[in-house]
Design a protein with these regions (language model features):
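C-terminal segment of N-terminal export signals and the immediately downstream linker at the start
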Residues: 29-63, 68, 72-77, 87
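N-terminal secretory signal peptides and thylakoid transit peptides that target proteins
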Residues: 1-22
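Rossmann-fold NAD(P)-binding glycine/threonine-rich loop
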Residues: 132-165, 174
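Nucleotide donor/acceptor-binding cores
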Residues: 42-44, 126, 184-186
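Internal alpha-helical scaffold of NAD(P)-dependent oxidoreductase catalytic cores
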Residues: 91, 158-164, 182-221, 225-226, ...
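Short, well-ordered coil/turn residues at beta-beta hairpins
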Residues: 17, 106-107, 131, 167
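Rossmann-like NAD(P)-binding element
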Residues: 85-87, 92-127, 134-138
């Protein structure tokens, strides 16, 4: 009986989420959304240009977006930008945060407090794609806290003022920039409380070959990390079925 009740609750949550997604994708008159739709190009600042940030950012450049890469190793970022061409740039994390209409943060979770403090004024009111996952073995106590609180809600506290979308969290880093090339569509589960941010992030995800699937608000972001039912590569329909079972 309890299992059936949980399933019904999950289905109700999924129907609510589906309604939010539909409403979000029908939004009109939002200045940034309209501008992005008209030009087809967005300036993206990437903070953390490792396997996820560097890989996804490279695919965005190839899709026609203008991207600035940043990390602790500027020479790495300069070499990456030079290889990608005129739409790719290298800078410091602060320069990337200032450059981007959208900012993607892809750093170890243990670095988020420092990143949030250093970039707070630059990412305030900006759409921030949060790819960071808390691993206790790597990030220590802050990962324990984030996993207990839920990674989405924890990131809100660590990146105050940002309009957060959790995405690119469930698929392994080694496959992140290539999984979309395989036959069949792969879904990309996302979570956010911000309707406009959902639209913009969904378009960027679609641009690189994934199907964006909104699973809910940032509280549901706790499921967007390795080790949860949503981890790994799933079709859009598989993601929807999994979400319907979550409580």
């Amino acid at each position: 009986m309890k299992a059936k009740a949980t399933t019904r609750q999950g289905r109700r949550r999924f129907l609510q989420v589906s309604g939010v997604a539909t409403a979000a994708l029908m939004i009109e008159g939002l200045p940034f959304t309209a501008r992005a739709a008209n030009s087809g190009k967005i300036k993206i600042g990437i903070v953390g240009s490792g396997r996820v940030g560097g890989g996804i950012g490279s695919v965005w450049v190839k899709a026609g977006h203008e991207v600035m890469f940043s990390s602790r190793h500027i020479e790495h970022d300069k070499a990456l930008a030079a290889k990608l061409g005129a739409n790719a740039h290298a800078g410091t994390p602060r320069e990337a945060a200032a450059f981007g209409e959208v900012v993607m943060i892809s750093v170890p979770y243990g670095a988020l407090p420092e990143v949030g403090k250093n970039l707070e004024a630059l990412i305030k009111d900006k759409i921030v794609i949060d790819t960071c996952n808390p691993f206790v073995w790597r990030d220590g106590e802050i990962a324990t806290w984030a996993r207990k609180k839920g990674a989405g809600l924890a990131s809100v506290e660590l990146l105050p003022g940002a309009r957060i979308v959790r995405a690119f969290n469930a698929i392994g880093a080694a496959r992140m920039s290539t999984a979309h090339q395989d036959p069949g569509r792969i879904g990309m589960p996302i979570a956010s409380d911000d309707a406009e941010a959902i639209v913009v992030a969904s378009n960027l995800i679609s641009d690189i070959g994934y199907d964006p699937i909104l699973i809910g608000d940032l509280e549901m972001g706790k499921y967007l990390m390795p080790g949860t039912p949503l981890s790994g590569e799933h079709t859009p329909e598989e993601i929807r079925k999994i979400v319907a079972t979550l409580d």
